[in-house]
Amino acid sequence: WETTDAAKEQILWGLAHADVVKISDEEVEFLWGITDEKEAAKKLLDEFGIRLAMITMGPKGAYLANQNGAAYAKCPEVKPIDTTGAGDIFGGSAVSRLLKAGKAPEEFSTEELGFIGQFACTAASISTTQSGGIPSIPEEAAVLDRM
């Protein structure tokens, strides 16, 4: 983007057309100056009509929320080597669990949101222990074993 205003405009357009959103705490602060993940999730759900908001907070974990509830997920402690792709791996891992469940995003319970978040946080954390983005994507069994 040529300017930060242009970036914000395009990101906000994308949010207005999304059902499931994975967004980082840094991106939330950039867009709205919000530093509280609960407030950010509420904004996404209520003002943008997002059906499932996933706010990632780096090594601190993630906060997942829909209209049924919300859950925090903690990341396992690791010694990171390369964080390239960790956010993408979180998003892809979360979406894999959503698709496996075969439910609408707003139908997940607080417990299910917690499991999805924990799975995605674990996958992202494992990925940081290796170099590279794609080569560091862990297998499902490795993620489940680490949980």
What are these regions (language model features)?
Residues 1-43, 51, 60:
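Conserved beta-alpha-beta core of the PfkB/ribokinase-like small-molecule kinase fold
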Residues 35-147:
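Conserved phosphate-binding/catalytic region of the ribokinase-like
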